[in-house]
Amino acid sequence: MAGCTRKLTHLRKRIHRPRRRTTRRWKRWFKFRKRKGEKRPRPNHKAVARRAKLKFSTSEKLHWPEQELAKKSILNAEDSLIIDNKRSISHLSSGVLKDIFTTGTSSYNVLLQSKEEKKYHSQKQSSSTYSKRCRKPSKSPNTSRSKDPRRMKALVPVTSSGTWYCLERRPAVFVTSSVSSPVKFTHDISVTGNGIVLPPKPKSKVKWCHFSTLPKPKPQLSRSFEKGDDFSGKKFCILTAIKPTNLEKEKLRFFKSDYTYNPQFEYANPALPSVLAKHSHASDRFLKQIVVHLTEDLLSRASMTVVNGCPTLTINVSTAREHWLEGMLRHEIGTHYFRGINNLQQPWNSWTGRKKHELKPNNPTEEGLASIHSVLFRKDPFLWRAALLYYTVYQASQMSFCELFKDIGRFVKDPNTRWDYCVRAKRGWTDTSQPGCFSKDQVYLDGILQILRYRDTIDFHLLTALGKVSYEDVDRLKGLAVTENMRVPHFLQDHGRYMEHLEKIMEVNELTDRELKDLI
């Protein structure tokens, strides 16, 4: 039992007396304990004294005593802990001591800069060069001279005769100043024996900047439309560039003028004149076959009549809206999305690939196919919207905004609906009092009629699987295409039913193969 107590006491002493290099000592202790019949070696008194000196000289807790201690000193020159004065004696000038003790930046210790003035200046230059290289904020001269706390030297006054002790990690050195210091201190410095570890010097947080030669990624724009440049070199989608910024303001002004004021549109990033000129040519190819009348007074959903020898389609707008959402999903998802996904797998998925394989523009096939899918499963699949857009664009190329607004009033009674059609046709133009149009809206009807014209020879399943291609390129590209894992909408799975819906569209809109052959 006594042996156990002795072992526990010994363990407690080891636990409550932490020293430096703990891991190495514990390994050594366990190694000795493993040896059978051998006792733990007793500590070396000289080593204990040496570690005490290191512990004492590494960090000291300094304070200003309240009483006058000018003639008192905790450290004595005859003490055994103060080493002998034969080792590295440093001589400090009074200027260095004055500069050290009058800075006011060291609250706990006073630093010894160097042995000589020359070495001090060289270290200062090297530290300033390093700080510039690291892009650290500027420091005061006092702060820049501070070193690692573990390497600091502390000067402690022992007597009032100009004698100083230099304390560092090595055994303390007795320093005698050859020149008496003219500085008078109101309080002396005393050193306590219980040393604590001084907190490390606070490091200023430096914000590192990363400089890369790579250009920043730009937001991707839609490839479906041409781009317009602004003065800063940025590229914008043509549909974004021609969107007026003062649309609501001009709309109120137009309605207050009783439809006599021609709006003056403004644009944040106007399209280039060359781009507008390319889209300002309207066609009258299908005008003689189209008359559309939108109204809310019609009892039925729609009706087809003949007025003055011209076929007229009358649409009840209020009842037709309930089918728009389903048609919009087939238009955007079932056509544009699926063809876009399939196009990514093909060799012509880039502009370079399209040029290499000599592909024709995907419009009007793209928008014509999407417009057909919008009305594919409707009870009355009228093509009145595509026809009205085609007509409005052509009239806009011949009329001012006010004249166009009055002209389509024959077919559209609601002023807000008429405003929307006129704005679409006049997009990109600043002064709408002049004739001019944005001709993109004509591709819907143009594409519809071309697809219906060649519906018997087009492979619609392959037309979707090949991606963004024209129906004219399908036969030529099918041998080069990647057809595995292609996505096709559900309404194209049954080819027979799909063709029946196309025939119904022809019948409802009173289109015949002979008329289509004459037009196309």
Curated annotation (Swiss-Prot):
InterPro entries: MATCAP (IPR012548). Its cofactor is Zn(2+). Its EC number is 3.4.17.-. One of its GO terms (molecular function) is carboxypeptidase activity. Keywords: Carboxypeptidase, Hydrolase, Metal-binding, Metalloprotease, Protease, Zinc. Pfam families: MATCAP. It comes from the Eukaryota. Residues 116-153 are annotated as: Disordered. Putative tyrosine carboxypeptidase. Putative metalloprotease with an atypical HExxxH zinc-binding motif instead of HExxH, which interrupts the active site-containing helix without affecting the integrity of the catalytic site arrangement. This is Putative tyrosine carboxypeptidase MATCAP2.
